[in-house]
């Protein structure tokens, strides 16, 4: 099964991801026959259970590979569908990477959204504000946006995010 078949007919795009990452994900896909035809699944790297592949889930699973392979984050420091509370309202952040020292504090929040930039950026910022996470990432598979929450309600654009082995203070001192 090709990932392009799963996203066909949508506005999703996988141009942010390498051929190697796409092939790695495609090799993990299994088809389950149902009365209405076939459905495609894979075992999630973080949840360690089989999940149905939707276009948004394809982008999320590919971005997990980026976080693991390129940025060296451990799946043990990640949670998917992390609950974020706003008063009595509860929402779910797509991917959360927890702080190295304070393992219950969100460090990076990643939102994977439909292919319209504004659809998720404000939501991502609200999640960062609600949790105190200093880094936010938004992606739809074609575009990506990295943000640093400098002060509450003030975000600056970043060109990359820190790797797992970088302290935030060192990351910011080196890049300038």
Feature locations, PLM:
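A short, conserved, highly charged catalytic patch centered on acidic carboxylates
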Residues: 1-135, 142-176
């Amino acid at each position: 099964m090709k990932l392009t078949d799963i996203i066909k007919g949508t506005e999703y795009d996988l141009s942010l991801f390498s051929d190697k990452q796409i092939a790695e994900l495609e090799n993990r896909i299994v088809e389950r026959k149902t009365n209405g035809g076939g459905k495609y699944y894979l075992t999630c790297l973080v949840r360690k259970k089989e999940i149905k592949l939707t276009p948004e889930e394809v982008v999320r699973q590919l971005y997990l590979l980026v976080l693991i392979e390129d940025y060296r984050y451990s799946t043990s420091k990640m949670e998917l569908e992390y609950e974020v509370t706003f008063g009595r309202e509860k929402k779910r952040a797509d991917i959360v990477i927890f702080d190295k020292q304070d393992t219950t504090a969100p460090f990076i929040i990643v939102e994977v959204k439909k292919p319209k930039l504004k659809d998720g950026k404000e939501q991502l910022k609200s999640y960062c504000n609600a949790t105190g996470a200093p880094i936010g990432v938004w992606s739809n598979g074609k575009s990506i946006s990295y943000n640093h929450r400098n002060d509450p309600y003030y975000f600056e654009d970043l060109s990359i995010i820190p790797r797992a082995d970088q302290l935030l203070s060192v990351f910011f001192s080196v890049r300038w």
